[in-house]
Amino acid sequence: MALRGQVLTPDDAGYADVRPAYNAMHPGSPAIVVVASGTADVIDAVNFAREHDLLVAVRGGGHSVAGLSSVDGGMLIDLAPMRGVDVDPEASIARVQGGALWGDVDRETQAFGLVAPGGVVSDTGVAGLALGGGEGWARRKYGLSCDNILSAQVVCADGKLRTASADTNSDLYWALRGGGGNFGVVTSLTFELHPMGPIVAFTGVFYPVADAAEVWRGFRDWSLTAPDEVSALCACTTLPAHDALPPEIHDTPFIVIGAVYSGDPDDGMKVMQPLRNLATPLVDISQPLPFVGVQAAFDPFFVRGTLRSYWKSMYINDITDDMIELLARKAAERPSMRTFAPITFLMGGAINRVDPEATAYSERSANYLLSIDGNWSDPAEDQKVISWVRDTWAEFAPYGTGGVYLNFRSLADESEDSDVENTFGDNMRRLSEVKAKYDPTNFFRRNNNITPTG
């Protein structure tokens, strides 16, 4: 391969620098790493891998908790140098390269008081998050990341670059919005932008774990009438000392409520005030803040490459009183300091106003998303934490809709977690047909895989 970017093997200087990924359990050991400088490099890499029968993993931001952004013994196509973000403020669109992080996008769009709905961690890759759904601080007002994709440039399994939009390859466009990395290497995405920021109302309040049931109940009750402008979450964890965190919570278990208002900051602080009075806080850092700062506020919770992680999720419609008691019990018995008792994301709003068949992402009725995030450091604790997450998920399963959020899916090859079909529901058949058209041999299978028909 004659590339403008780098080609690295395990014997090359620099290989060790690009090998690690988000989850320390899954660093991967690729035989070849292609550090792509542009679309031409991606095309050459795909053609080479196809001709030499190499299993391919694609890394945008490298934030896959399941380790899908690396591979053992195959080829890793690393898009890290491709981080360009072009904003057209008059048209309210942004063209984003496949290796960009959400922090890159926020910096460029916020210069114009605009936002592309992204995640809640600035270090997350844009493409991976958006292709799997994308649930961030603007989700209830402006929808998921995938709902705001206007077009994509995709290098497919045959090595051809295709544009996918509502008017061109519309079947591929439909599948990309929720179908993940099944259909090719996405080298760029064009997003619709919306007015938000540069200052937004932010709620960040930390309560004692002893008040978990009271706080979750208050969060539930408030969420029932919350306006679409508010996107919020409630969770329990413990964090070590960090300059970005208030000292009152260093090494102290807490329940945190995070919320952002997509509108006038003064109005937002009033609307979210009840979330600050659910119990006596350990500390309350709620205030109007720059949106770029809010996007980075949860970065210390999810530090790249330092933790071993195993997560499971589910969508639910209601938080019952019985479920609140279960949430509080799980908050008190977490198996490791950095494990999250279920993060409860408030969904609904604009998300649920999209027809389930309009995009591959089909969960359009749930009011909440639960994510049980096991995070730890010592490999000797692998089985303990993984078992706790699985058992906890099983206890909550009766409350679930049957679907999971695929971006929060771990160990994608384990049989008990093979829930892709349940998640896509009635869209699964159509996805398999699109897969057969653009990737009939399942060349791109290092993902939450969709099997091609035929």
What is each model feature region?
Residues M1-G454:
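Soluble FAD-dependent oxygen oxidases
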